[in-house]
Regions:
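N-terminal/domain-start alpha-helical segments
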Residues: 1-110
């Protein structure tokens, strides 16, 4: 059975590109386009990895991560355009397993 990835990303073109690359590599991908939906799916579904944008509508990625960590320990990689050291430290302190800045090569996620 393929590993399942939840991709929470509000930029539809980027989400589609990442989804296609991951599916090509054999992963099963479910998408959410806002933080609230992403959190709901993360808490109700079974995922091997969550790729989570920080700047999302409805609920920020950081808030999604904080709430998620109260109930689940699913690995989370934050995807963001924020590249300041303070942002990376904040993300990792909040419970992210990794922090990848945009733009990125798909190989950084595999």
């Amino acid at each position: 059975m393929a590993e399942r990835i939840l991709l929470v990303e509000d930029e539809e073109k980027l989400a589609r590109m990442v989804e296609l690359e991951l599916r090509y590599e054999g992963y099963e991908v479910e998408k959410a386009f806002d933080g609230r939906t992403g959190l709901e799916r993360a808490l109700t579904g079974e995922f091997d990895l969550i790729l989570l944008d920080i700047m999302l509508p409805a609920l920020s990625g950081m808030e999604v991560l904080r709430r998620l960590r109260k109930e689940r320990q699913t690995p989370v990689i934050l995807l963001t355009a924020r590249d300041a050291v303070v942002d990376k430290v904040s993300g990792l302190d909040a419970g992210a397993d990794d922090y990848v800045t945009k733009p990125f090569a798909i190989e950084e996620l595999l």
